[in-house]
Amino acid sequence: MKILVIGSNGQLGRSLLTSLARPYPGTIFWDRQALDLTKLGVIRARLENLGPQVIINASAYTAVDQAEQETALALAVNRDAVGEIASYCAAVDAVLIHVSTDYVFDGAASAPYVETADTNPQGVYGASKLAGEQAIAASGCRHLILRTAWVFSPYGQNFLKTMLRLGGERDTLSVVADQIGSPTFAGDLAEAIVATLKPVREGDCAWGLYHYAGDASVSWYEFACEIFAQAQHMGFSVPDTVNAISTSEYPTPAPRPAWSALDSSKFTGVFGQPSSDWRAGITTCLQALGQLSK
């Protein structure tokens, strides 16, 4: 089974490098130099030349605020390029495993979102990701779409690494406390994707849309406090004070859903992979970052 991962330099892509190494050692990894998703005219030809049987799309335009000024670019990567990949898969009966986002929801819920919940993205980023999901469904290809949320890892830019950087620079931090989500360790998300590959290979997969995210509904403030509690124990510099603030006190160009926690129970029931243990994920990240700093 020839597997291709698109987006090998991102948080998920780098985590997949580790998770796929032993069970699927022949996996091919493409970064942006190997396949630039903004160049729509070359995507189909590149895929046809390689001939993958399974494509894991771990790449996306994820600059949530910048997307408000770069609508065309966000749509090109998150909708049009995804449509090209799905079209290839449909033509050759390949499988597409695609990662989407909690930002397809408006945040009006009060319980974790299930897959059948109504979508209503509030910004360009969420709208572009939803359009990508729709393009996959319209293609008719065999697919798995995994919506996830608040991804963090030792790699790239993410909330955990931002908190550690700011915590080492400032005595006091203010963090939004009225946005609720499900922090997801990228290593767990990678393992969840690996868990789908056995039924994919055996042709006995329940295709469709799934949620996979952290096992709790917490605020950014609570997330930050847990990061700093663990970081202090491991010898990282942390702020003296972390203040809880409202979204209105920290305006951003793109609106964020006030509630975007995801219910992973469908995925766990089908594929047997438990939802991400976000606290354990923080521990793993901090240990890795501590080793990198030595």
Regions of interest found by a model, annotated:
Residues I3-L20:
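N-terminal Rossmann NAD(P)H-binding glycine-rich loop of SDR-like oxidoreductase domains
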Residues L40-R79:
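NAD(P)H-binding glycine-rich loop region in Rossmannoid oxidoreductase-like domains
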Residues P154, Q179-A190, Y210-Q230, T284:
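Substrate-binding strand-loop-helix patch
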Residues D277-K294:
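Amphipathic terminal alpha-helices
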